[in-house]
Each structure stands twice: as structure tokens, then as C-alpha cells.
């Protein structure tokens, strides 16, 4: 391995770690303040992955060249508008979108929305114009960190390390690692976060803690927002949110005259009205005056490419379909890159049925669950053999990747595949790799604060509890320390509270309006009663989830569902 070279962790993770090769070993960089010399277990697992060594066509091993010919011929003989380009987030380097450039020019259908952060992102955009996190220094300079629907110490372990001595408050139905480290844990009922945000705003007003200067000079609609908070008697929130008023008082006492940060995660927005819910939380933050202070602020999964011009983008008139609702069977050819929709997309049964009825190309580093349904598998080169730049959705530092290992035979990078196809079809060429990488390396985005905050002024959210029967369970999913979405060490259990009446190792059948699947039970006090918890990557969970788009952002809403559980 070449020494003194950079390696960016390619994985979909807030931390976007920078590594470097030292004496033939890959080590976390000490110069990157977030990475701070350490990498995680998932990085170690990534290095040990059994990457594809040959291409596969109709279950037979073939060479890379043969696979590229089959792909070109198939694309030439298929109507472009009957093809779909589907990109997952297995590698988040900027060079990954080279192929999207080709498929845009070719005329494929593309996807819109997200399986991840789309709803919440839209909510922030509606209030502040763009989804941008404050500089990480402001998090480090705060006194109190409210962790809202995010498993902060697990899903961004490096960001957590920078602030681990702060006082934490966690709002989560599950007793997560960070909840156990918190001074207050509000074990909230699922999909009631907007109610808690309204209640907290009401208490903020009752205790004269609102930021009058911000409300007068930097915002619009605060009175309308405050009106919504007054719609209901204060005590009625206790039953619906499951959060005692005493804890609400405790939180406000804790934050009074303190520098406050709120780190919001996916958990609050895996629902139909995810954007409205996020906007309520951001509005509470605005009301309390968390924005525009020297320290503190609100963090979410920011738009990591904000302020950069996409060097691989090309304008096209391509049709776009919601990624949550993709019907793979309606295309003659489906090209899947860096994704594993058989496990990660909602409604596994319809995903599999769809894939069985289309010509499926998987462009991937490893033979994943989706490859089982592929006609053609093209091996992507390892991240160690690709030049790239990794931007972060957690903080403002970028990571750089040089080539530290020669690409394995019969593998190809995303950039080279795109270049090859573009030349085959005589399309407009890509910029050179040097030019693209230099642009991202040399461009610094200066943080600009939003001008004015727009409060949410109307609310229309249908709570899940309204339709929940006493035998129903809420579906909750969250990331695991030992896996990265569907990659690495997968846990297929359903986790239930002891009050569920089930016991360890029970075989249960779980049913939802969208499908059913069998699971083995693990009992845990950490799970709130009436919740069924599954780690992300569980091979069965998405048999239960709706392949429908949320209200406004075309994104998935994995938790907009109620479950029935019985012994099987
Ligand atoms: N180790 C590891 N790290 C990862 C990943 C991984 O797979 N493994 N995945 C990466 C990716 S792709 C992403 S997007 C990020 C996401 O990272 P996070 O934002 O932390 O997302 P999740 O773990 O999905 O969910 C966060 C929390 O929301 C809680 N929750 C669920 N429903 C509700 C609710 O209604 N209200 C509230 N208040 N909380 C709720 C869950 O219990 C969970 O603890 O993590 C990244 N980092
Ligand atoms: N029920 C439920 N479902 C969820 C979630 C949840 O919390 N609960 N989380 C959602 C979230 S936040 C996300 S982000 C999505 C993630 O969903 P996906 O984007 O589908 O991610 P993975 O399932 O991890 O699959 C990534 C694949 O990319 C491949 N890969 C890795 N590196 C490269 C590379 O360099 N090049 C190429 N071509 N391929 C590569 C790997 O082999 C791996 O199989 O899942 C979503 N699905
Ligand atoms: S913490 Fe995240 S970015 Fe850092 S090495 Fe692990 S997976 Fe990669
Ligand atoms: Mo994600």
C-alpha cells in the first residue's frame, strides 16, 4: 500500500472520517478534528469485505469487458424512457454521481425524494431556506445538548466524542445509549414530537424565556405559531406524548440562560407529515432563541453539497419517480448502484416482485441481497482504488481519497464506467477527474446564517395513536453500532418490552396493512411498551413498511404503520 496517502471513509455516516495510510496500515487522521485519530468497527468491517471479483450474467461468472458489452447492447436495444437509474447510498463520495450524468443524458427515469432524511430536510428548508448545520464549533461551545430522535453516540460517534462532557437531554421512545448517558430522558410516544415541541414552546412563554429580540427582528409568524401551542389544555399533552409535565419543567430549568444545541435525527420524521414535525421542532428552537446565537443551534442531516456546484451534473428533462414508491416491474431495465433495495427500501415483497419482472443490473462492490434478483452484476472497485472527495452531512469538514491500492482485475470505478458508456453513446464528456476533484478540494464554503426564520403557522398532523388499538404496536427502527444500514453484522430480532407478554426466543408473526413476516423475539427493558424495535438492516422489517411517499417530499415513511403481533 502507498504510504502518506489519504483515504476518505465512503460510508453513509455523519462523521465522514478522514483516514491515512501509515506504514501500510490505514489509521484515522489526527489532523481532522472530528476523526481525531480513530476509526470505527464498521470501517474495520468494510476493510474485510468479500468484494466481487468477477462480473455475473445469468448466474454465470463473466469478465468485466463482457459485462460492459452486455450492458451497452441492452441499453441500445431498450427504450430509454423504460429504464430506471436507482442509486443507493453505499458510497457517499462525490464521484459516485458520474453514472447519473450518463443515465441523465441517456434519458432514464430518475428517482426523487429519499429513503433517509427527506421529510425533515424539507421542514427545515421551509423555515430557513436551506438545510445547513451551524459550524461544529458552536456545538462544542454549547452547555446543553438536546438529542431529539437521534442515537447520537452510536450514529455519529466522532461528533459525540467532541462533546461527550456536556449535559444531555434525550427525547426518544427507546432507552438508547445516549439516553442512558442523559440527565433527562423523555421516553416519548412515537410520532408525538410535534406535540412536545408545542408544549415546550408554551412553557417557554409561561416562564418568559422566549427570545424577544429574535422573534421581533429575525422571524415571521411567531404569533401564529404561538396560537397553535395554545389550542389545547397543557395537561392533555401528558397522556398523548407520554412525557410528564415535571420533565418539561425540568428541561426548561436546565436550559435557562444556557447555551443550547439541539441535534435532531431521523427518528422524528419517518412519518407522513415528517416535514411538519421537523418544522415544529425548529420553530420551538427559534422560539427559545437557539438560532443565531454565538453558541448552540440546531443540527440535522444537512445538505452536504450545499454551496458547491455539482461538477458531474448535467441538465435533463428526465422523468422522476418517488424513491419510496418505485415499481421496479414497470421498467424494461433497472440499473441499481450502491444500494440494496431488497433490504433497505420499503415493502420488500413488492420490491422483489418488481425486480423479478425486469432486467436488473446491480453495480456494487459486494454481492448483496438485491444481486440475488439481478440479471447482470458489475463489480465496482473498492474505495481504496478510487479517487474521491467525501462531503459531510454532520459537520463542515471534507475528507479526501487518493488511490492507495491498484484496482482489482474485473472491477471498474463509477467514473470509469460512466466515461466508458458516454463514449459508447457519443454523449457529452465528463470533466476530467483532476478537474472535478480539485474543485471540491479547493472550494471552501463559508457558513452564512439564514436571514429570517418562518415559523410554522398551520398544523395538520394525524397522530398514529388516534387509530391505534390496544393490541397494536408502533414500528420503530434505528441504526446499530455493528452495521451500516444493510451492510456487515445484521441483527434480525424484534425487540419488545417485557409488558408485551412475549418472552425471549418466541417465534412471532408480525402483520401490518402492508405485509407480514416472522421474527424471533428479544425482550428488553430499553424498549418502550407498545413499541416493536428492529435494527436497520433487519432482513424482514421492510416486509411491514408502506411503499408510499410522505406528504410533501416524495420520501419514505417507514414508521407510518401500526403492527399486530401473534405467536406463530
Ligand atoms: N453505526 C451506524 N452509524 C450510522 C448508520 C448505521 O447504519 N450504523 N447509518 C447512517 C445513516 S444512513 C443515517 S441516515 C444516520 C441516521 O442516524 P440517526 O439520526 O441516529 O437515525 P436512527 O438510528 O434511524 O434513528 C434515531 C432514533 O430515533 C428514535 N425514534 C424513532 N421514532 C421516534 C419518534 O417518533 N420520536 C423520537 N423522538 N424518536 C424516535 C429511534 O429510537 C432512534 O434511537 O446514521 C448514520 N450512521
Ligand atoms: N426499515 C428501515 N429501512 C431503512 C432505514 C431504517 O432505518 N429502517 N434506513 C434508511 C436509510 S437512512 C438509508 S440511508 C437507506 C440505505 O439504503 P441503501 O442505500 O440501499 O444502503 P445499503 O442497504 O446499506 O446498501 C448499500 C450497498 O452499496 C454497496 N456499495 C458499497 N460501496 C460501494 C461503492 O463504492 N460502489 C458501489 N457501486 N456500491 C457500493 C454495498 O455493497 C451495499 O450492498 O436505507 C433506508 N432503509
Ligand atoms: S464513524 Fe462513520 S465515517 Fe467514521 S469510519 Fe466509521 S463509518 Fe466511517
Ligand atoms: Mo440514511
Model-derived features with residue positions:
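A cross-kingdom feature strongest in bacterial/archaeal respiratory oxidoreductases
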Residues: 5-9, 141-181, 189, 320-408, ...
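N-terminal leader/propeptide and maturation segments of large enzyme subunits in energy/redox metabolism
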Residues: 207-244, 405-452, 510-513
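Generic recognition of stable, solvent-exposed alpha-helical segments in well-folded globular domains
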Residues: 35, 66, 70, 97, ...
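N-terminal export/assembly segments and adjacent metallocofactor-ligating motifs
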Residues: 1-206, 221, 244, 337, ...
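A glycine-rich, hydrophobic/aromatic-adjacent loop/helix-cap motif
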Residues: 255-328, 390-394
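Short gly/ser/thr-rich secondary-structure transition/capping motifs
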Residues: 124-132, 317-321, 359-362
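Generic, well-ordered alpha-helical scaffold segments in large soluble proteins
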Residues: 70, 74, 105, 148, ...
Amino acid at each position: 500500500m502507498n504510504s502518506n496517502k489519504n483515504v476518505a471513509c465512503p460510508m453513509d455516516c455523519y462523521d465522514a472520517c478522514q483516514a491515512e495510510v501509515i506504514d501500510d496500515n490505514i489509521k484515522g487522521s489526527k489532523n481532522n478534528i472530528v476523526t481525531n485519530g480513530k476509526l470505527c468497527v464498521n470501517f474495520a468491517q468494510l476493510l474485510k469485505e468479500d468484494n466481487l471479483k468477477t462480473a455475473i450474467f445469468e448466474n454465470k461468472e463473466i469478465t468485466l469487458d463482457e459485462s460492459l458489452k452486455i450492458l451497452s447492447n441492452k441499453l441500445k436495444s431498450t427504450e430509454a424512457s423504460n429504464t430506471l437509474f436507482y442509486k443507493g447510498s453505499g458510497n457517499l463520495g462525490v464521484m459516485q454521481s458520474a453514472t447519473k450524468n450518463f443515465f441523465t443524458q441517456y434519458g432514464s427515469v430518475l428517482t426523487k425524494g429519499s429513503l433517509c432524511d427527506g421529510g425533515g430536510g424539507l421542514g427545515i428548508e421551509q423555515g430557513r431556506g436551506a438545510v445547513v448545520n451551524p459550524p461544529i464549533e458552536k456545538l462544542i461551545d454549547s452547555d446543553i445538548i438536546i438529542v431529539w430522535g437521534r442515537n447520537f453516540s452510536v450514529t455519529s460517534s466522532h461528533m459525540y466524542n467532541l462533546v461527550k462532557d456536556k449535559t444531555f437531554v434525550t427525547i426518544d421512545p427507546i432507552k438508547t445509549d445516549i439516553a442512558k448517558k442523559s440527565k433527562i430522558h423523555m421516553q416519548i410516544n412515537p410520532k408525538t414530537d410535534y406535540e412536545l415541541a408545542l408544549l415546550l414552546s408554551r412553557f417557554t412563554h409561561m416562564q418568559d424565556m422566549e427570545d424577544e429580540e429574535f422573534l421581533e427582528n429575525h422571524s415571521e409568524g411567531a404569533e401564529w405559531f404561538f396560537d397553535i401551542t395554545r389550542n389545547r389544555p397543557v395537561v392533555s399533552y401528558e397522556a398523548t406524548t407520554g412525557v410528564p409535565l415535571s420533565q418539561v419543567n425540568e428541561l426548561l430549568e436546565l436550559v435557562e440562560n444556557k447555551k443550547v444545541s439541539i441535534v435532531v435525527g431521523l427518528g422524528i420524521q419517518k412519518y407522513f407529515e415528517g416535514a411538519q414535525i421537523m418544522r415544529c421542532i425548529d420553530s420551538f428552537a427559534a422560539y427559545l432563541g437557539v438560532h443565531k446565537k454565538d453558541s448552540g443551534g440546531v443540527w440535522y442531516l444537512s445538505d452536504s453539497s450545499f454551496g458547491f456546484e455539482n461538477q458531474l451534473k448535467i441538465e435533463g428533462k428526465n422523468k422522476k419517480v418517488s424513491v419510496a414508491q418505485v415499481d421496479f416491474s414497470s421498467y424494461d431495465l433497472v440499473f441499481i448502484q450502491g444500494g440494496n433495495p431488497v433490504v433497505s427500501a420499503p415493502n420488500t415483497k413488492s420490491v422483489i416482485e418488481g425486480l423479478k419482472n425486469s432486467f436488473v443490473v446491480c453495480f456494487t462492490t459486494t454481492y448483496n441481497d438485491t444481486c440475488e434478483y439481478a440479471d447482470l452484476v458489475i463489480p465496482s472497485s473498492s474505495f481504496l482504488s478510487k479517487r474521491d472527495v467525501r462531503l459531510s452531512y454532520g459537520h463542515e469538514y471534507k475528507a479526501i481519497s487518493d488511490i492507495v491500492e491498484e484496482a482489482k482485475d474485473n472491477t471498474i470505478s463509477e467514473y470509469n464506467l460512466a466515461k466508458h458508456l458516454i463514449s459508447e453513446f457519443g454523449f457529452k464528456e465528463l470533466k476530467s477527474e483532476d478537474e472535478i476533484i480539485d474543485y471540491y478540494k479547493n472550494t471552501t464554503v463559508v457558513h452564512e446564517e439564514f436571514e429570517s426564520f418562518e415559523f410554522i403557522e398551520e398544523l395538520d398532523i394525524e397522530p398514529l395513536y388516534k387509530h391505534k388499538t390496544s393490541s397494536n404496536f408502533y414500528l420503530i427502527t434505528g441504526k446499530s453500532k455493528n452495521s451500516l444500514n444493510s451492510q456487515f453484522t445484521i441483527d434480525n430480532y424484534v425487540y419488545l418490552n417485557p409488558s408485551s407478554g412475549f418472552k425471549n426466543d418466541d417465534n412471532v408473526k408480525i402483520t401490518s396493512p402492508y405485509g407480514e413476516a416472522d421474527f424471533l423475539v428479544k425482550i428488553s427493558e430499553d424498549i418502550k411498551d407498545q413499541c416493536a424495535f428492529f435494527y436497520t438492516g433487519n432482513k424482514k422489517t421492510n416486509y411491514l413498511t408502506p411503499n408510499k411517499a410522505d406528504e410533501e417530499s416524495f420520501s419514505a415513511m417507514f414508521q407510518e404503520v401500526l403492527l399486530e403481533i401473534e405467536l406463530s
